[in-house]
Structures are given as C-alpha cells and as structure tokens.
C-alpha cells in the first residue's frame, strides 16, 4: 500500500521543478496520486476495509487542497499537472 523509496524517487524526478525539489505542489500531488491509486487497488480486494477508506478520503482531500492552491497561484502549472497525471478532464 505504501509507495516504495525507488518509486517515490522516480516520481520526484519526473515532477520536480528543479534539482532537489521535493516540496513543490506538483511533487506532492504526484506522490499523493500514487498513494491514492495504490489504495484504490487495495479496495478492489478488500471492499469492507473502512478504516483505510477514511485514510483514502483524507488523501483525496489533501490532494484537492493542493490542486486548488496550485490553480489559484499558477493556472498553467495546474493544467500541465492534471494533464500529466491524467486527473479530471
């Protein structure tokens, strides 16, 4: 269910704005998206795991807040990110 260190490093490298960037909204949203996708797969075989479902909802809301922030600050980066991650339209 967790993101492995190698996978997280790859996600950071793909979405970083500069070398060593780990805290930009783009990187945070990409890591959250990976965790959300992992939990979604988990629920396909564990449908009644309501404790983890709460965690999933918290991750989705955190990602939503970060995306709202990014959209408010820089709409071009927002549209590029949702296109790259395959979110929304």
UniProtKB/Swiss-Prot annotation:
Q: Which GO terms describe its cellular component?
A: cytosolic small ribosomal subunit
Kindly state a single biological-process term from the GO annotations of this entry.
translation
Which GO molecular function annotation, any one, does this entry have?
A: rRNA binding
UniProt keyword list: Ribonucleoprotein, Ribosomal protein, RNA-binding, rRNA-binding
- Source domain of life is Bacteria
**Pfam families given in the database record:** Ribosomal_S15 (PF00312)
NCBIfam families to which the protein is assigned, alphabetical: S15_bact (TIGR00952)
Q: Which family does it belong to?
A: Belongs to the universal ribosomal protein uS15 family.
> What job does the chain carry out?
One of the primary rRNA binding proteins, it binds directly to 16S rRNA where it helps nucleate assembly of the platform of the 30S subunit by binding and bridging several RNA helices of the 16S rRNA. Forms an intersubunit bridge (bridge B4) with the 23S rRNA of the 50S subunit in the ribosome.
**Which protein, by its recorded name, is this?**
Small ribosomal subunit protein uS15
Organism listed in the record = Rhizorhabdus wittichii (strain DSM 6014 / CCUG 31198 / JCM 15750 / NBRC 105917 / EY 4224 / RW1) (Sphingomonas wittichii)
Gene name, please?
A: rpsO
């Amino acid at each position: 269910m967790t993101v492995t260190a190698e996978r997280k490093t790859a996600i950071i490298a793909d979405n970083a704005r500069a070398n060593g960037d780990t805290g930009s909204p783009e990187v945070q949203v990409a890591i959250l998206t990976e965790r959300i996708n992992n939990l979604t797969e988990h629920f396909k075989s564990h449908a009644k795991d309501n404790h983890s479902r709460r965690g999933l909802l918290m991750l989705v809301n955190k990602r939503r807040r970060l995306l709202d922030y990014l959209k408010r600050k820089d709409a071009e980066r927002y549209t590029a990110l949702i296109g790259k991650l395959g979110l929304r339209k």
